Amino acid sequence: MTHWHITSWVVALILVFVSYGLYGSGKAKGAKITHMILRLFYIIIILTGAELFVRFANWNGEYAGKMLLGIITIGLMEMLVIRKKKGKSTGGLWIGFIIVLVLTVLLGLHLPIGFHVF
């Protein structure tokens, strides 16, 4: 299940950049399609993350913090795409998104079921 989870968030990150770029270049139809596919990947990420949480959690704060950071990351991804679609500025959101994404990945790698890079 860990591989499904990692694959789904990697694909979701790619789709965020594709959707963002398509909305920026004015290709609304392609952007709408990729955005809907991205939303399906949000659901997959949440379901696989919840399954990992229930199966492997020692019910401590690190797992709960990782889950909270993951949900915030998904929220920021959606906010980036929507604000770009509406033509609003996204500078501050990009900074917050990158910070939360890095924290989420680092915490995920630190937990026992993550890949042990450090």
From Swiss-Prot:
Signal sequence, renumbered to the chain: none
Transmembrane parts of this sequence: 4-24, 33-53, 62-82, 93-113
Keyword Transcription regulation tagged: no
Keywords: Cell membrane, Membrane, Transmembrane, Transmembrane helix
Cell location: Cell membrane
InterPro entries the UniProt entry points to: UPF0344 (IPR010899)
Gene Ontology CC: plasma membrane
Membrane topology type: Multi-pass membrane protein
Family: Belongs to the UPF0344 family.
Name of the protein in question: UPF0344 protein RBAM_010920
Organism whose genome encodes this protein: Bacillus velezensis (strain DSM 23117 / BGSC 10A6 / LMG 26770 / FZB42)
